[in-house]
């Protein structure tokens, strides 16, 4: 027998009574975006659960994609069978004999939304249970926590049988908590921060600062690839490339070396905030981890934050580097992040950056520059690209193109 659909059980959105259908519709949209790499797959949702119709597509590939989508609590692959008792008996016997191992217990859980079906749920439980005993006489029934819970659902169009419950990613559907601007470098931390924001339903847009010729096309592609890895959790992400060369050259020419990093980060924050305002974002998200580098001391954060009143979310702020790496490996961004391309945060990094910069000093150095003009030109020069999910085979094609 071949799986015909995957039944989706919702996560935390089940508690959002007033906005329930908005959450469900957003989850449906996200599933359609992520599963768009499987052209024959279709998605339907209702108030209680979702249905992913495979239409001949390999179940295992689709299941791997579903495991990453936030808002899904669990899912079950299901067999579609003809809606009559004899067919159900044969299907249940075939499934049970294929999955049963010595000592396992079982339970039949039948329900029907089609109340015209010839047996009610209780009678169907008994009939199908007897059918299992007839082919597996040594099996034992267990009502609480059985090894195999065979679920049978009678719908208007057909009957569906499932026995597996596969854990989903949990969290909230991406886009149900508003929009945030993710400051995405090419490092390990910021993609993890983006992932954690996505998990809580934030629709992220990735803001990446590029400083050619100091940063290479390889660094830009790396940022694109990191963004694409994040699309598997909720669908398309807008990638915003910010031209940053002029600003970095100006800072280097007019400020003391010890303050280069602080001033650079203040400009980045101003620009990201301006983009956020233009694109109706609510927050800024970054990958700062307290004490990890000189620009991530509390004093540095205070000096950098001073340029905006917008909330700054730092999902990894209390994590050790190894904790962040563990998540990066889990979400498959780590190997990309360690590719040897310099980003604009490293190209002019001073040997001894100021770890406790003073706000009054940063403001004094910025008076030497046309801050507003620099910010306006950078924002005017942004390039926005839609990054979409892609199949693993596309990754191979991209690698071949890069080599050629």
Curated annotation (Swiss-Prot):
Q: State where the protein is found.
A: Cytoplasm
Molecular function per GO: ATP binding; CCA tRNA nucleotidyltransferase activity; tRNA binding; tRNA-uracil-4 sulfurtransferase activity
Instruction: Report domain THUMP positions.
Output: 60-165
Its chief place of residence is cytoplasm
Annotated SMART domains: THUMP
List of residues binding ATP: 183-184, 208-209, 265, 287, 296
Major enzyme class: transferase
Pathway listed for it is:
Cofactor biosynthesis; thiamine diphosphate biosynthesis
Record field: transmembrane: none
Q: Name one Pfam family in it.
A: ThiI_fer
**Keywords annotated in UniProt:** ATP-binding, Cytoplasm, Nucleotide-binding, RNA-binding, Thiamine biosynthesis, Transferase, tRNA-binding
Here the disulfide bonds are none
Q: Please list the reactions this protein catalyses.
A: [ThiI sulfur-carrier protein]-S-sulfanyl-L-cysteine + a uridine in tRNA + 2 reduced [2Fe-2S]-[ferredoxin] + ATP + H(+) = [ThiI sulfur-carrier protein]-L-cysteine + a 4-thiouridine in tRNA + 2 oxidized [2Fe-2S]-[ferredoxin] + AMP + diphosphate; [ThiS sulfur-carrier protein]-C-terminal Gly-Gly-AMP + S-sulfanyl-L-cysteinyl-[cysteine desulfurase] + AH2 = [ThiS sulfur-carrier protein]-C-terminal-Gly-aminoethanethioate + L-cysteinyl-[cysteine desulfurase] + A + AMP + 2 H(+)
A single Gene Ontology biological process assigned to it is: thiamine diphosphate biosynthetic process
Enzyme Commission number(s) from the entry:
2.8.1.4
Q: Which InterPro entries match?
A: Rossmann-like_a/b/a_fold, ThiI_AANH, ThiI_fer, ThiI_N, THUMP_dom, THUMP_ThiI, tRNA_STrfase, tRNA_sulfurtransferase_ThiI
Q: Name one GO cellular component term.
A: cytosol
| Function, as annotated | Catalyzes the ATP-dependent transfer of a sulfur to tRNA to produce 4-thiouridine in position 8 of tRNAs, which functions as a near-UV photosensor. Also catalyzes the transfer of sulfur to the sulfur carrier protein ThiS, forming ThiS-thiocarboxylate. This is a step in the synthesis of thiazole, in the thiamine biosynthesis pathway. The sulfur is donated as persulfide by IscS.
Protein family:
Belongs to the ThiI family.
Can you name this protein?
Probable tRNA sulfurtransferase
State the organism of origin: Streptococcus agalactiae serotype V (strain ATCC BAA-611 / 2603 V/R)
